[in-house]
A protein has these predicted regions:
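All-alpha prenyltransferase/terpene-synthase fold signal
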Residues: 1-168
Length: 168
């Protein structure tokens, strides 16, 4: 409970509000909805992924690091934002891949639901192999940023690798 710690609550609310605002999560969702049923260009697809999944995971990393031992270190927070963005882009690429390549039974939810809804996905735009390469690239970026942050982050490193290798 941080109700008696406005010095912590105010920055956390600011981080989350920035991630959720019209220039981030809300804007990305709007573009995602507008792109349904069409083939988006590279800039639109990037905007959607950066401002939805990327922004959300960027905020999560920044808030977690802010509350940690190195929370006052702006350099660490910058690395955390970069880590979160890379992780978000890797996660989104894997999500698109899994939706396109796994069965309903394997996923535990409807497979190919993105295609059925006419969603703008990396697979629809780039194809399976290039999307897989993007997932690997962004995962390596995230691992690099996590290692640079340092500290007791073995769980984070394992989580990043798990997200690349997940099956659902």
């Amino acid at each position: 409970d941080y109700s008696d710690r406005p010095d912590l609550v105010a920055p956390l609310v600011r981080i989350l509000a920035n991630a959720a605002g019209s220039e981030r999560l809300v804007g990305g969702q709007m573009e995602d909805l507008l792109a349904e049923g069409s083939t988006p260009n590279a800039d639109t697809l990037k905007y959607i992924h950066v401002n939805k999944t990327g922004a959300l995971l960027m905020a999560c990393m920044e808030m977690g690091l802010f509350l940690g031992d190195k929370g006052g270190d702006e350099e660490v927070l910058i690395l955390g934002r970069r880590l979160g963005m890379s992780l978000g882009l890797a996660f989104q690429a894997m999500d698109d891949l899994l939706d396109a390549t796994r069965t309903t039974e394997e996923l535990g939810k409807d497979a190919e639901s993105d295609a059925a809804q006419g969603k703008a996905t990396s697979v629809a735009f780039r194809g399976i192999e290039e999307t897989r390469d993007q997932a690997k690239h962004h995962t390596e970026e995230a691992l690099s940023f996590a290692r640079e942050i340092g500290g007791d982050n073995e769980f984070l490193l394992e989580l990043i690798v798990y997200l690349l290798n997940r099956k659902k």
